[in-house]
C-alpha cells in the first residue's frame, strides 16, 4: 500500500520543492528514464534522481542524461530532512526503489493534492477542468496524458499575451481509486430528468 512507497512520496515532495532536476525543458514521456507502463510524471523524475544519486551527482554523468547535477544534489538535503521527520513520527521507510508502485503513489497524491484533481476535456488539446471549475492545459509529454482523470502536484499561471494555466507533475487516476480514497469527500446524487426522445423519466447517479 501507500506505506510501502513512503520514501518515494518523500522524494516526490523534495522534487516539488527543489528546482527542476533536468537541464533543459524535456518532455518526460520521451525521457530515457520513462517506462512504458508509467502513470506518473514522478516515475521518470525519481529514476533520474536515483541515477544522479548513485553517480554521486557527478557533472559529466548527469549532464549525459540532461540532469542538472546541482539541482539534484539540492533535492537530497530536502529529501533527508523530510525522511528525518517521518522517522521521528515512527514511520517505517521502505528502501528507495526505481520500480515502485505507481498506484499506491497515486492514492497518496489524491489525498495530498485533492484541490488539483482534474479531468481532460479534450485529448487533442490537453485541455482540462480542475476542481473548482478552473481551466488549464496538461503539460506536453506528461506520463498522465492517456488518462481522462489525473491529479497534479503543480498548477501554475503563466503570464503571456493571455494568462494560461499549466498543469504539471501529474499522475493518472482511475475512477475506482478516486472512490476508494475519497469516499468521505464524494457525494452521489440521483437526478431524475425527462428524456424527450424516449418519452420517459430517466434517473441518473452522478458522483461529485
Predicted regions and their residues:
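Second RecA-like catalytic domain
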Residues: 1-207
